[in-house]
Amino acid sequence: MSLIREIAGGPYALAAGPDGAMWVTLVHDGAIARVGADGAVDRFPVADGSRPSLISAGPDGALWFTRNGDDRIGRLTTAGELTEFPLSEGSAPFGICAGADGALWFTEMGSGGIGRITVDGQTSGWASVGGTPSMITRGPDDAVWFTLNQGNAIGRLHPRDGVTMRELPTRGAGPVGITATHDDAIWFTEILADKLGRIPLDGALQEIDLPGKPHAVVADPSGGVWVSLWGADRLARVSADGDIETFDLPPGSEPHGLAFGPDGGLWVALESGFVLRMPD
């Protein structure tokens, strides 16, 4: 099954909700969209200039998202109830994920921090890492892993161990997207170097050439990862062995966020104004 829905406002990132729908940030319109299992689209205004960016399902059954434009974390229930939690001015939150501790963890691009927010809205700053932290994910080791877009490194944070950094071998790589896979590895994109990176928890960092400005990456439940090639209007599927298969999208699509839906299908946010479910 394939499905495409036109959604104005700059679809940027997606997350599967507990209600069986896909939830989408609309970075240009300051809104969140819901795409139901039947394809119906609902919109939930957030605020002008709020720039909703990354989104994650929380352990409380709500959707949590970063407001990069007005320094807030947003929470939206599946019934449409919106709550906001202010952060420091200029923090510019971007990446967000659910952690192993039942809280949400997020990056602050502007202030260079890693923050934590509990489901009842208590925020705390855990680390100042610099380097423009971008996306963040829960790792198979229950730490959070994040990309340092201007720091040319991958960071790992665990409340017990603190912060460690892995410098990338390619200079000026511009890492952005990051995900954890079922084979105990961390995968990440290098948008400025046209590469995909992989860090096994028990091995050395690896890099794979992947032209097309790779942006987001998501783990495939069947193994390997999918990557949005923002600069080439394509998607790539990369196996655990490094084999690459690409899929063309319409010209000017600007593919960004990727997420698997409750039905097991891959969904893609196209900043040009569409949300696409890839054919099975």
From Swiss-Prot:
The active site is at H256 (proton acceptor). GO terms for biological process: antibiotic catabolic process; response to antibiotic. Substrate binds at H215. Its EC number is 4.2.99.-. Keywords: Antibiotic resistance, Lyase, Magnesium, Metal-binding. InterPro entries: Quino_amine_DH_bsu, Streptogrm_lyase, Vgb, WD40/YVTN_repeat-like_dom_sf. Signal peptide: none annotated. It comes from the Bacteria. Mg(2+) binds at E254, E271. Its cofactor is Mg(2+). GO terms for molecular function: carbon-oxygen lyase activity; magnesium ion binding. It holds the Pfam family Vgb_lyase. GO terms for cellular component: outer membrane-bounded periplasmic space. Monomer. Belongs to the Vgb family. Inactivates the type B streptogramin antibiotics by linearizing the lactone ring at the ester linkage, generating a free phenylglycine carboxylate and converting the threonyl moiety into 2-amino-butenoic acid. This is Virginiamycin B lyase. The lineage of its organism: Bacteria, Bacillati, Actinomycetota, Actinomycetes, Mycobacteriales. The gene is vgb.
